[in-house]
C-alpha cells in the first residue's frame, strides 16, 4: 500500500500526465505514491454529459453542477478506483542518485487531525493561500482528493455537503486566475509529495528550501568556477564550511529583503542576521603621523566597538589600511 494516495476529479484527465514524470514517477514506481484520475463526466447524465449550468441570479459564465460533483465525491470517498497513473518510464539504473527514492517509514498525523476522513483540496482563487507550511502538513496525509473546477467554479453546496465525508480546504496558489484547477493540482501535488520521506534522495534537500525557515533560498552555483567571464563567489571554494554557511545565510536574508520584504517581518532575526542585512565591505586608508603597534591595537578595539567584524589592519609607514565589514563606514 502506498504512503500517499492522490485522487483527482477533473473533466480533463490527460492534464494530469505530468504526475507520472521524474521524481513523482519514481515515487509511483517505488510504491510511495499512488495516483487515481477520475473523469467527472462519468457521473454526468444525458446525451451531452453536461457538467455545468448557468449561474442562479444571472451573470457571465457557467457553474459546475452539484448533482454531478456530489455523487463523484461520494464515490471517491468510498474508495472508487480511478484510472491509475503509472511511472512514465521504468528506472533501471540501480545506482542511487541524488534524486532517487529511498525506503520510506510511515509518518503520523499531527495532533488534532481526523485521519478517518480524507483531505479534499479545492483549488480556487478565492481560497486560502497555499504555503510551504501547508505542504509540510499535507505530506503526512494518507489520502488527498483534488476537485478541479472549471468555468465560474463549482456550486458551493458541493463543499458544504462534502464536509460530511472530507476535511475540506479551499486553497489558492496565487493572486491570479487560471482556466481550471488542474495546473494548481500539479503544483500542490509536487510541493507535497517531495516532502514525503524517501522521495528526495538527499534528506537535507527540502530542509534548505525557500520558505522552510521563513526566508527565500539564496543563489546556487556549480562547476566551472569561472563561466563566460563570470566567477562564482570565492567563499564557496574556500573549504571553510562555517564561512560558506554564513555566506548562504546572508544571501538568503538579502534576497528575501529585496524580493519579499514582508517575510522578514514574520521571521525571528538574530543579531548576526541583522548585521548581515546592514553590513557592507569597507576598505579605508588612514594616514597617522608616527603610527605604532600600540595605535593599531587601540584602533582595532575602537573598530570592534564601532561594529566592525574581524577588521584587518595593515601598517605601512604612517599609513593604516583598514579592511572589514561594518554597518557603518569608518
What are these regions (language model features)?
Residues 2-4, 224-305:
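SAM-dependent methyltransferases
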Residues 37-58:
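Short, surface-exposed acidic-centric catalytic microdomains
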Residues 51-72:
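Short, structured active-site "lid" loops
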Residues 65-84, 95-101, 108-150, 197:
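S-adenosyl-L-methionine/SAH cofactor-binding core of RNA-modifying enzymes
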Residues 154, 158-209:
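Structured adenosyl-cofactor binding patch, chiefly the S-adenosyl-L-methionine
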Residues 183, 195-235:
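Internal, active-site/partner-interface "lid" segment
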